[in-house]
Amino acid sequence: MHTPARTATAAALAAATAVALAACSTPADDEAPGVTDDTVTIGTHQPLTGPAAAGYSAISAATSAYFAYLNDNGGVHGRDIEYIVKDDGYDPSATQSAVRELVTEDEVLAIVNGLGTPTHSAVLDYLDEQEVPDLFVSSGSLTWNQPGVYPNTFAFNADYVTEGAALAQYAVEQRPDATICVLGQDDDYGEGILEGVETVVDGNAIAEIQTYSTANEDVTAQIGAMMAAGCEVNVLGTINGFTAMAVGTAAALDWAPQWYVSSSGGDYPTLVGYLGEDVAPALLQGMVSVNYLPFSPDDPWVALFRQINDDYNDGAPFTGNTVFGMSVGYLFAEALAAAGEDPTRASLVAAVESGELLGNGIVPLSYGPDDHAAYRSVGITVVDDGVQDYTGTVYSVDAGQVTTVEAEPVPLANDGIPQPPEE
Amino acid sequence: MDRLVFLLATGLARGAVLALFALSLVIVWRAARAVNFAQAAMAVCAVYIAFALTAASGSYWLGLAGGLAAGAALGAAVERGLMRRLPHLTPLPGMICAIGLVMVLQSGLAIAFGPEHRPMRPPFSQSPFVIGGVPVLSPYDLFVLVTAAAVMGALALLFAGTSLGLRLRAAAFAPETSRLLGVRVPRMVTIGWALSVAAAALAAILLVPTELGLNPHAADLLFVNAFAVAVIGGLDSPAGALAAGLGVGVLVSLTTGYVSASAAPLAVLALLTAVLLLRPGGLFAAREARRA
Amino acid sequence: MRTLLRAALITLLAIAATFGLDPFRNYQLATAAGVFAAVAGLTVLIGLTGQLSLGHAVLMAAGGYGYAATATAVDAAAPDAGPAALLAGLAGAAAASGALGLLLGMAAARLRGPYLAGLTLALVIALPSAANVLPLGGEQGLSAPFLPVPEALSALIAVEQWHAWLAILISAAAVTPLVLLRAGRPGLRMRAVLGDETAAALAGVRPGPVKTAAFVASAVPAGLGGAVLAVATQQVTPGGYGLAFSLTLVVAAVIGGLGSIGGAAIGAVLVVALPWLVDTAVEAVPADLGQRLNGNLAVLLFGAVVIAATLARPDGAAGLLARLRRPTPAAPTPATPSTNTER
């Protein structure tokens, strides 16, 4: 019979194939991998394919566009930034493979803006073991802010609990007697928003709590239940597509409650893309959301980012994701500029921890040696007449306490090209 | 009570689309003894054509007709160009080829049109009629139900009452004998594929306006649920596809409404397991398929 | 005995090969070893008994969860217990996947081809929901203990290489019994059931128990493969075992050649390496076509390769090897489509 001999041959062949794939590079163990005389190489993992690509593939494109603009204007310390974007299709095992390749093969200086809670959780321990700076994670999970456990990991988004608490606080102030309900994604995102709402509103006072799963693009049953429960203010911990679906489904039922939406699902231009330009302004009128990045139509940052989007991103649709991606790029460039003439992994982390980075938010960054969260306060936005803008109300959330604070927008300087700190 | 009526009505409308897609799987199974794993990707290709035609002409109906024609053409092309060239002794090469085709079509669509969701307008209002204070079916839901029922009826007539239907079934069940009797078996298989993908395209065209919008993955879940529906109903049985489709639609709606959204796939799995344990060939299994 | 020697030899060769690989390649090798164990189980199931399972990813996940839960518990109860956590974890993986395999196998014994396919497909879709409803950590999954390089070796090898060794050893332990099973009496019984159930029953082989046993025998290596992935990644998430991955396992089994363990090895290496190779090749081409091409082109080319390979060699790589060894063409397979396609 053929079996054992053939098995041996085939296995040997497979092993030989694997050996043939071997490249001769070994990871450099110096302190500044990815840094040459004229380049700095960094990497990220993003969902470029698969169902999650629809919402998020625009972010890394915007970041790349900002870096192209930066490189055309001299880069940082004379070095161009090379941004390697790896696709993980929002699959945690693909993230594992992508990030290991970035660290060991591409020898990146840092991982920047890795997207997603389940995906990035999968590489958190690995990046910690390898002591790779893990900057500006693109998710609102509280996991990223554990300086004692993960000294090199830093969050970028305001966390979901903060957003939920701010939305609930605004709802209570605007409409003290309204019936509040929550619709959330069936994961840490929805749970975080709910937790935030519960810090402001007593859990029993939430009339209806519904969840959805991204696999099933239908929220009719959930919206029906909320309508039956007489909800007046619906706090949504939903991604943009499901925000649109919730609003559209309610409209079909002739139901017009107030929508209070987390920043991850309350981006007006993206929602218009889902709902269609003809009906969106009416359906989204009065929608409340939160944000911490420049988004007012007349903001100089927005004007600059629009220009970069036209020049370096083929004029892709300009949405909240565009601002998000470019803001991440700017913040990294600022950190790199502050990390010194010859940046290392350690000096990059030290630069972020120094607390001296400004970013470009409407509220201050909160990075420090003991705090790896980026934004602890958020501003309320409202859609009026097809324009989403800040109301001026800003909440800071700390240890379950919501307090009103003043906005402190960072002014645009030097055309968005970070300068090395003065000696 | 109000909530029950609302959930039942919603479930029926969703179930009609499921039933139609499951029917398309039954057609290709009857015609070629194959489960087409690329059915969703092929249907979505046809929807993109329908979408483009509607956008260009402004007429939903022109887009619908174009989408159906494109589905039929795609089905015939895939059968002639790919499936026919594979050995039919086992279903596996056809299945693997279909999985490869899914990758090619979905990434091709994503390259050509981007991953964005494109909103598709329904031809009728989605605001439900309110009866006794309870919102029930919308005009669009009724359109979906009527269309699905009409297509089911037409196909039942085709298979039971016409010579073409007879030849289609004969070619699938007894290809050798049919050939001897003068049935052009290869042509029958091609016709079966074309009919099947056209039906799947119709189901997808009906589904997309109720979802987020058209994207390369718009029909993925539809396929998976419809496959479960076809298996529950019995792969040979159009009536089974109809009954199981409506049943699964209602089950998903009730589970989502009364338990939680994440419990719905488990409920479908439980129903599927229960039915198969009691009737291994599905609810409406023909006697021949039940021997085991 | 010869099989055992051969298995030991191949295992040693594979371990020796890890010295020629850099850390990332060793990580890929560990992944491929885990996938190999699962594909080997699947290929024996489909090739010998004709039962088409689309749900082997869930069996892998069951093994991964079993490993993570048990190993974490043992690690917490007795830290520094050395290999105890690993061994207990592997036992947990085998138990979890074996139990699920038994349940599925009992259902599968009553079902024919597409019906079993439908059931296992629904199982894959239900996995994320099950992870939410059961205490399996939801979307984030469970984490498994990190196994550092033993001190005696730490000067010699990196952690990726150590994990590759573990992966190779576990996979060898998972697949070798499968090879023995396939060559021995159980293999004959399975083939008898595949050939003609009625004839097999007349010859005293009861098809039901044989099919169920084959499912369990296929599920345990798959579960150990899941444990291998948990060792290499320290994580089990439902997202890692989705529909696409489950279908990829079937693709690997068929491309390798059904029923062939060597083919399973080729298939596993292909599905791990090919997308990455294509991706690398695509990156080398200056792509000014914008972000849409990014990632998608790799999937497209992978799909095209799968189609081309199926058209060229429906019997897979193992069939191609057999053809190369034996210059005279094999006897033509009967091409009559008949009712037995309804397996």
Language model features with spans:
Chain C
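Transmembrane alpha-helices and adjacent helix-loop boundaries
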Residues: 1-343
